Regions:
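Positively charged n-region of N-terminal signal peptides that target proteins for export
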Residues: 2-4
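Short hydrophobic "helix-edge" motifs at membrane interfaces and signal-peptide entry regions
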Residues: 11, 39-42, 263-264
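A cross-kingdom marker for long, charged
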Residues: 241-305
Length: 305
């Protein structure tokens, strides 16, 4: 079983709740990243695949993404990271992740799974007794975020936080395709069997974290679509319900929103998790089927502008 952990990147609300230091602007990293120029009936915009978490020592952005940001007068993200009440959102997420008072996590999980979870929680520094009041989806995110942080990958260094801070300084408005409440409700509405599958994969793959994160970061910077698809989509073959809920339905809603946009005088930059740009149900493929044309931006093209 392979690397489903990478797929939680697209839904980690910690992106919106982290500290946001001011990252110095850079000339961009050497690879092309994952950036498209999209043309359609309502004008031109950029579509970029993001890494919500990056390593603080490797936080520079690909040159095509830098170009897309410079050329855009507004930013569209999964959620509006500039308009979130952090304390309120954190409280809602914690409340949503709580088990019902009468529920018992050890009984819901079974003895073997509970033992493995308790060991993983202890290794990550969490109190198992307190954590036992959370639903499996919340525990999956907790363990994943802790594992990312141990390897130096943080949302404070991630693409959204960097561009949020820059957009504030550059007076570029930010909007969201969804709200934090919508993402919380999506996770909290997952069937318990799906949540158990999520937790199983998280526990199985924690040991692979260092290699997986570095491979994912390298593939994203290189714009290596086959490798990104292998890393990000492979686990969904055995979890079709999760794939439909987290990817297919959301991508289709976003395409509907994009098609409803009024024509703008200058381009927007649409920035979503890289997971949403790969595969037959990825945004580029869906937009093409909706009559849009897409063109990958290269390093040479970015340098020539």
């Amino acid at each position: 079983m392979r690397r489903l952990l990478a797929q939680w990147l697209g839904l980690l609300l910690w992106t919106a709740l982290a500290a946001t230091p001011l990252w110095a602007s850079s000339a961009g990293s050497g690879g092309p990243g994952l950036v498209y120029e999209v043309d359609g009936p309502n004008g031109r915009f950029y579509l970029a695949g993001s890494m919500h978490l990056l390593h603080a020592e490797r936080a520079s952005l690909p040159a095509p993404l830098e170009r897309a940001y410079r050329d855009s007068t507004s930013i569209v993200m999964e959620i509006d990271t500039d308009d979130i009440d952090e304390e309120r959102t954190a409280a809602r997420m914690l409340a949503a992740a709580q088990l019902a008072p009468e529920a018992s996590l050890p009984i819901l999980l079974g003895e073997a799974r509970w033992t493995a979870l308790r060991d993983a929680l202890a290794e990550a520094g969490f109190d198992a007794e307190r954590a036992s009041r959370f639903e499996p989806w919340g525990l999956s995110l907790m363990l994943t975020q802790a594992a990312f942080a141990r390897q130096g990958y943080t949302s404070a260094a991630g693409v959204e936080q960097q561009l949020t801070e820059r957009a504030k300084r550059d007076d570029k408005p930010i909007s969201g395709l969804e709200t934090a409440e919508m993402q919380i409700a999506l996770l909290d509405g997952l069937d318990m069997n799906v949540q158990r599958q999520m937790l199983d994969r998280t526990l199985e793959e924690l040991r692979e974290m260092p290699q997986m994160l570095d491979e994912l970061d390298a593939a994203w910077r290189a714009g290596d679509l086959p490798q990104l698809e292998a890393l990000l989509l492979e686990g969904y073959r055995e979890m079709p319900e999760l794939y439909t809920a987290l990817l297919v339905e959301r991508n289709r809603r976003w395409v509907t929103q994009i098609r409803a946009w009024q024509q703008a005088a200058s381009p927007r930059l649409v920035l979503v998790g890289a997971l949403h740009l790969v595969g037959e149900q990825g945004l580029p493929a869906l937009l093409q089927r909706a009559g849009y044309t897409t063109r990958r931006l290269t390093v040479d093209a970015a340098a020539g502008e």
